[in-house]
UniProtKB/Swiss-Prot annotation:
Methyltransferase; part of the gene cluster that mediates the biosynthesis of the tetrahydroxanthone dimer neosartorin, which exhibits antibacterial activity. The two different monomeric units appear to be synthesized by the same set of enzymes, among which the Baeyer-Villiger monooxygenase nsrF is the key enzyme for the divergence of the biosynthetic routes. The pathway begins with the synthesis of atrochrysone thioester by the polyketide synthase nsrB. The atrochrysone carboxyl ACP thioesterase nsrC then breaks the thioester bond and releases the atrochrysone carboxylic acid from AacuL. One of its GO terms (biological process) is methylation. This is Methyltransferase nsrG. Keywords: Methyltransferase, S-adenosyl-L-methionine, Transferase. Disruption phenotype: Impairs the production of neosartorin but accumulates no metabolites related to the neosartorin pathway. Pfam families: Methyltransf_11. Pathway: Secondary metabolite biosynthesis. Its EC number is 2.1.1.-. Belongs to the methyltransferase superfamily. GO terms for molecular function: S-adenosylmethionine-dependent methyltransferase activity. Residues 49-141 are annotated as: Methyltransferase domain. It is an enzyme of class 2 (transferase). The gene is nsrG.
Length: 261
């Protein structure tokens, strides 16, 4: 397995499961981003959807921007995005790592939209430099298991990716405790003038059943590679959620909004 560039190298069946298993993003999510961008005097010319997969959010971005660049590290994902957006105007497509942006003119992008992708970029400083290169002044940057380590061809890099997903307030890290020694914590870049806001948004709550829980698990690319690792957990879920018992919860979301000076 390649470390980062093959995690989401999946077929259209996976992406169908992905769209079913991941949260239905509420309008409030995009409204917050667009309102912030407008309040900062940003233009709505070009937005770059990086790590876009098969482009599930591209049309929503196009509803406000004149042009959407859809890019992903996996060529097949970009082909799936082309099919998904066939006949639509205002889109261009590129296959590239997030860190590689030399083909994009400096200062030509009004917003970089990075959803569930920044933790894969390594090294992080090169990724941020690539984002800064393409953003015009006043433009917006929006970022919102052990078996995996054993199969990765660079466990140290994969450990850094997993550590960057470590959450707070009860969110469990993906990195096994006895593998933390492989890497060091990422630095905290929160500055004294940055605002951290915690709030509840009902749009991220959900109620589902056993089938819905399994759809969510199957939206992660490594689940299908290690079916045996989930056998016992699925057996427990079958007992807990028998007879259509509902599951209620919410998806925790962290959004970073930053304007290029």
């Amino acid at each position: 397995m390649e470390v980062n560039d093959k995690f989401f190298a999946q077929d259209d069946i996976f992406w169908e499961n992905y769209l079913k298993g991941r949260p239905r993003v509420p309008d409030s999510f995009f409204d917050r981003i667009f309102d912030y961008h407008k309040a900062k005097g940003g233009h709505f010319g070009t937005v770059h959807d990086v790590g876009a997969g098969n482009g599930p959010y591209a049309l929503r971005l196009r509803s406000r921007f004149d042009h959407v660049i859809v890019s992903d590290i996996v060529a097949n994902n970009i082909e799936l995005a082309r099919r998904r957006l066939q006949g639509e105007e205002g889109f261009s497509f590129r296959t590239s790592r997030l860190q590689d942006a030399d083909d994009i003119a400096a200062g030509s992008v009004d917003m970089v939209f990075a959803t569930n992708v920044m933790h894969f970029a390594d090294p992080q400083d090169i990724a941020m430099a690539a984002i800064a290169h393409q953003l015009r002044p006043g433009a917006l940057f929006r970022q919102g298991g052990r078996q995996l380590l054993n199969k990765a061809n660079d466990p140290t890099e994969t450990a850094r990716v997993m550590l960057r997903t470590q959450g707070t307030r009860g969110i469990q890290s993906m990195l096994p405790l006895d593998d933390v020694h492989q890497t060091t914590p990422e630095p905290n870049y929160t500055g004294p003038d940055d605002a951290e806001i915690y709030e509840d948004d009902e749009g991220w709550s959900f109620e589902t059943d056993l089938a819905g829980v399994k759809e969510h698990f199957e939206s992660f690319p490594f689940v299908s590679q290690f079916p045996g690792a989930f056998t016992e957990m699925y057996r427990e879920l079958d007992d807990l959620l028998a007879d259509g018992k509902p599951v209620q919860g919410y998806f925790p979301v962290k959004v970073i909004l930053a304007t290029r000076s």
